[in-house]
Amino acid sequence: MRKNRALKRTVLPDPVFNNTLVTRIINVIMKDGKKGLAQRILYGAFEIIEKRTNQQPLTVFEKAVDNVMPRLELKVRRIAGSNYQVPTEVPPDRRIALALRWIVIFANKRNEKTMLERVANEIIDAFNNTGASVKKKDDTHKMAEANKAFAHMRW
């Protein structure tokens, strides 16, 4: 076990939008340390979003992330030899992390040709409260609602 809790690293805002949330999704998109490629993908997706919605891409993105953020999640708790899925509230930082991760995961699973289009369409779908990432949030909430009886086992 570690002696002290690991400190949270500060995330610097990105150079174009001067926003830390944009930097965080760039870091989620990034593979093998190729940050420049991840930035090109996201900024290209933002251009597509601006063309399709005629709105500021940053506001669309922030609303999309807000629509995907889960309030509750299930944690497995072992009590007297049996496992229970206990619904717990998600901390604010983890809410954002899960939302960004789900947007990128479900963007990857889409059928569009380029990653730019996939990310753009997933963000637009999340903005409109449709799409796979919003469905994932709804499924998580349904599971938490179904296991509400075990909520008293929180720790």
UniProtKB/Swiss-Prot annotation:
One of the primary rRNA binding proteins, it binds directly to 16S rRNA where it nucleates assembly of the head domain of the 30S subunit. Is located at the subunit interface close to the decoding center, probably blocks exit of the E-site tRNA. This is Small ribosomal subunit protein uS7. Belongs to the universal ribosomal protein uS7 family. GO terms for biological process: ribosomal small subunit assembly; translation. GO terms for molecular function: mRNA binding; rRNA binding; structural constituent of ribosome; tRNA binding. The keyword Metal-binding does not apply. It comes from Mycoplasma genitalium (strain ATCC 33530 / DSM 19775 / NCTC 10195 / G37) (Mycoplasmoides genitalium). Keywords: Ribonucleoprotein, Ribosomal protein, RNA-binding, rRNA-binding, tRNA-binding. SUPFAM superfamilies: Ribosomal protein S7.
